[in-house]
C-alpha cells in the first residue's frame, strides 16, 4: 500500500544519496548504487553496491552493516542510482527475496510515476 513519505523517509533517502555521492565510481563501474536502511531502533546504515563476477547489491551491504552492529529489526529501506543519487530504484529480485526472508515487515521506498512512496 502506498503511503506519503515522512521526514524520516526523506532523511533515509538523503543518506543513500550522500553515500553514493561520496563513493560513485562509474569509470570502473564499481559503485553506482547507494542504499540506506533504518532499523526499528531508528539507526540508519548505508552501503554501496560492489561490482564483481557475483556482485553485491547496495541494499545487501547496508543490511550487513546494520546486522554487524547488532540490529535485527528493520523499518524502511531505499536504494538510489546515479552520481547524485537522484533516481530511486526498486530492489532487484535477489534483494526482494532477502527482504522477504529476513525482514518481511520492512517498508521499501519506491518511485511510482515520478512520485516517491
What positions do the PLM features span?
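Hydrophobic "anchor" residues
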Residues: 43-44
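C-terminal binding/interaction regions
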Residues: 1-26, 71-117
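Histidine- and/or cysteine-centered catalytic micro-motif in compact active-site loops
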Residues: 38-40, 49-50
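Short beta-strand scaffold segments in enzyme catalytic cores
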Residues: 29-39
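Compact, glycine-rich, soluble single-domain proteins
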Residues: 48-61
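Short, well-ordered amphipathic alpha-helical segments that serve as non-catalytic structural scaffolds
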Residues: 15-19, 58-65
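Feature captures the catalytic cores and cofactor-binding loops of soluble hydro-lyases/lyases
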Residues: 61, 65-70, 87
